[in-house]
Amino acid sequence: MFVTPAFAQASGSVVGPDMLMSILPFILIFVIMYFLIIRPQRTQMKKRQEMLNSVRRGDTVVTGGGIVGKVLKVVDDNELELEIADGVRIRVVRATLMDVRVKGEPVADNKNK
């Protein structure tokens, strides 16, 4: 008996400022997330990529596994040859480098001799 009048009432449509006010918190959360998380992560990734691209012969580097070595030669765009002890050479993938500890002096090529 009492249910019939409730169904007979017209529902209010959500148009106008009420709709904007319901979406505004989600927009604000996304903007805050962009400036606190996404943007700093992009700059950090850009710095890391620049560091990886600037590795050259003579640099002392640390790999992801904690191996410290000196770059003997750049094999190609993705691989480096490191000397981790006297006479011990290993090849590593450039992306596994975590840090460049000491930037070495630029080594002159032997082509001029």
From Swiss-Prot:
Give the way it sits in the membrane.
Answer: Single-pass membrane protein
Give the matching Pfam families: YajC
Transmembrane intervals: 18-38
The main location class comes to membrane
Q: Name one GO biological process term.
A: protein transport
Give UniProt keywords alphabetically. Cell inner membrane, Cell membrane, Membrane, Protein transport, Translocation, Transmembrane, Transmembrane helix, Transport
Instruction: Give an example GO cellular component term for this record.
Output: plasma membrane
Where does the UniProt annotation locate this protein?
Cell inner membrane
Question: What does this gene product do?
Answer: The SecYEG-SecDF-YajC-YidC holo-translocon (HTL) protein secretase/insertase is a supercomplex required for protein secretion, insertion of proteins into membranes, and assembly of membrane protein complexes. While the SecYEG complex is essential for assembly of a number of proteins and complexes, the SecDF-YajC-YidC subcomplex facilitates these functions.
Quaternary structure per UniProt?
A: Part of the SecDF-YidC-YajC translocase complex. The SecDF-YidC-YajC translocase forms a supercomplex with SecYEG, called the holo-translocon (HTL).
Sequence similarity: Belongs to the YajC family.
Q: What is this protein called?
A: Sec translocon accessory complex subunit YajC
Q: What is the native source organism of this protein?
A: Brucella abortus (strain 2308)
